[in-house]
């Protein structure tokens, strides 16, 4: 499983998260809704990678950054392409 596939599966399995791909120039994003913690999301995503033997050998998580949009937060992975 690739890093991008793992992120997509994790988001599909986790309540309060959505994929955010409306700004493809920023890369693949995770929309963390409302009262959910983006830091907790990142920690749980890391645990998900460990549990599913996903290794970031190509450094695709490099440059990850966060933007706030109202009550929501978007975690961007600029090295991963958004799919439109």
Language model features by range: what are they?
Residues 19-84:
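Acidic, low-complexity, intrinsically disordered interaction modules
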Residues 1-29:
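An N-terminal amphipathic alpha-helical segment
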